[in-house]
Design a protein with these regions (language model features):
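N-terminal beta1-alpha1-beta2 submodule of the flavodoxin-like/Rossmannoid cofactor-binding fold
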Residues: 1-106, 152, 156-157, 161-209
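Short, glycine-/small-residue-rich phosphate/pyrophosphate-handling segment
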Residues: 108-152
Length: 209
């Protein structure tokens, strides 16, 4: 099972820290994980030129090419963003918009994957829920199944109060509780997904050699 995590922060700081923590936990539970950080990457905005509709690929040749490959390969996707202006980062927004080139190749290319959201705000109520909703909207548009940690603490995903420092986010016990609860549900859905997929293969006549 492959899990791909995207850190939408332009820095390798608090958002990167909690995403890496999440992926390390999954890795320890037997999942194959990979982290893509927007730090130092060149990913331009979607120009909506419709080149992808005709040529089945994006006209821009930048670091988004790596993201395209990993999005197709993963079973689970974690989107982690700092809260900026009450929403997601411009870096993550560009990645979302540029996914259009994948859909131009195959409308269902991301359908059935499992999605999870992480939002990190400088304030406790700094807009984390709005960031989650944007991530969840992206999941739903592309047929990705969004997973949260459930009611009472992690309704939409893992929410953190960073106070803009690594040392302070490490002290956010409530945030890490929301992360652990969301990861638990994320793992359950991933394992259920692979069970359903494997059962479908067997019914389709697939045989283990």
């Amino acid at each position: 099972m492959k899990v791909f995590g995207i850190c939408g922060s332009p820095r390798n700081d608090t958002t990167y820290h909690v995403l890496k923590e999440a992926l390390d936990k999954l890795n320890n539970h037997g999942f194959e994980t990979e982290l893509f950080s927007c730090f130092g990457k060149d990913i331009g905005p979607c120009m909506h030129c419709d080149y992808c509709l005709e040529h089945k690929k994006c006209i821009s040749h930048d670091d988004m090419l790596e993201v395209y490959e990993k999005l197709q390969q993963c079973d689970g996707l974690i989107l982690a963003t700092p809260v900026q202006s009450g929403g997601i980062s411009s870096n993550l927004s560009a990645i979302m918009d540029r996914t259009r080139a994948l859909e131009a190749v195959d409308y269902n290319i991301l359908r059935g994957k499992i999605g999870m959201s992480i939002a990190v705000g400088g304030d406790r109520t700094g807009g984390q829920d709005f960031a989650h909703l944007k991530n969840i909207t992206y999941f739903m548009i592309h047929g990705i199944i969004p997973v949260s940690g459930g009611p009472f603490g992690s309704n939409l995903g893992a929410s953190f109060w960073s106070r803009d420092s690594i040392e302070d986010i490490k002290k956010d016990d409530y945030g890490f509780e929301s992360l652990n609860r969301t990861l638990t549900e994320f793992e359950k859905f991933l394992k259920k997904f692979i069970h359903i997929h494997f059962t479908h293969l067997i019914k389709s006549g697939f045989q283990l050699v």
